[in-house]
A protein has these predicted regions:
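Conserved, mostly hydrophobic/aromatic
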Residues: 10, 38, 87, 125, ...
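Short catalytic helix/loop segments, enriched in acidic residues and glycine
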Residues: 22-40, 282, 286
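A metal-dependent hydrolase metal-coordination microenvironment
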Residues: 32, 37-115, 140-164, 177-180
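Histidine/acidic residue-rich metal-binding segments in metalloenzymes
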Residues: 113-123, 127, 145-190, 203-218, ...
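Mid-to-C-terminal alpha-helical segments outside catalytic/metal-binding sites
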Residues: 277-314
């Protein structure tokens, strides 16, 4: 079976490493993402999200975020062959035996309304900002907030900063109105871990109008491996890789073939797809994509599409 190098745009391993400081990123079996599993699965570049448990006390969230950055520096980056990607163009400089890792920020709860803290995270290497998780914060409402408001003044300030620093804005958890505000104002937009609402009705998936807006903007859509976002109401058991490929094929046929990628959400999901249960099994998905949509497209969705975006825009 051919091995395709993969850029995985979302995982929550930093949360686990911060909560369990005795875990080694090299080989701890409790992690979906570790060095051994990344190598076995052919993952060449892994995004590591800073994500704070929504139940954490609000005054502690900033410190928790800093603690996750410490876990990134003192555990992830200490492993042999792991390289910190601070600018996307550096991906092309990775050696054959190296794996690149980069930071993203999932939700702005940890900064309150302090733009200086956002700048600090970008200075630490954050290359993408998700304005919200599912809840509301001082930048925007998340998709789980019934009010459904869009960006606040602070939220627009964050987008402006991201534009100035060539940082992505991630729309995977944002409210519908927030999505529209981001698409109207952000320079680089990604849905780092979302699927197709028409095929699985979860509120976090993209609806037809959002898909069209992403297409028109040339924004990136990366698919998530959580079975609840793949298998609507668990209509069939078990959830299979072929069902996830249905979502990919849907957007391929909708004209977004050159904008698609992968964002597993490993270490952030407990409900898995059969034979796609950790990073070591990543090539199983690429094999099914190649069977259905061809080897060239499998290469594109795994790595090529994103690198072409980087070469055009960075």
């Amino acid at each position: 079976m051919k091995t395709y190098p993969i850029i995985d745009w979302h995982c929550d391993v930093l949360m686990k490493l911060h909560q369990n400081p005795d875990y080694s990123f090299y080989d701890n079996e409790n992690l979906d993402v570790n060095v051994l599993k990344l190598r076995k699965g052919g993952v060449k570049v892994q995004a590591c999200a800073i994500f704070i448990d929504p139940d954490a006390y609000i005054d502690n969230k900033y410190d928790v975020a800093l603690g996750q950055i410490d876990a990134f520096k003192n555990n992830v980056l200490k492993q042999e062959g792991i390289v910190h990607i601070k600018h996307f163009a550096e991906i092309e400089n990775l050696k054959d035996d190296e794996i690149g890792v980069f930071l993203t920020l999932e939700g702005l709860d940890c900064v309150g309304s302090d733009i200086t803290k956002v700048k600090q995270f970008i200075d630490e290497g954050v290359l993408s900002i998700g304005m919200t998780w599912n809840d509301a914060n001082l930048a925007c409402d998340g998709i789980g907030e019934t009010r459904g408001a869009g960006l606040t003044t602070f939220g627009f300030d964050v987008v402006k900063l991201a534009n100035d620093r060539d940082v992505f804005i991630d729309v995977s958890h944002i409210s519908l109105n927030g999505f529209e505000d981001v698409l109207d104002t952000a320079k680089h937009v990604i849905a780092s871990h979302s699927n197709v609402q028409k095929l699985a009705s979860h509120r976090r998936n993209l609806n037809d109008g959002q898909i069209q807006r992403m297409k028109d903007k040339g924004a990136l859509v990366h698919f998530v491996y959580c079975d609840a976002f793949v298998n609507d109401q668990h209509r069939v058991e078990p959830t299979t890789i072929q069902m996830l490929v249905d979502h990919i094929e849907h957007l391929h046929h909708a004209g977004l073939a050159s904008q698609l990628g992968l964002g597993s959400d490993f270490d952030g999901i407990s409900s898995k797809i059969m034979n796609l249960e950790d990073a070591s099994q990543s090539q199983n998905l690429l094999h099914e994509i190649s069977v259905r949509l061809g080897s060239a497209f499998a290469e594109d969705i795994a790595f090529g599409n994103f690198m072409r975006y980087v070469n055009r825009h960075f």
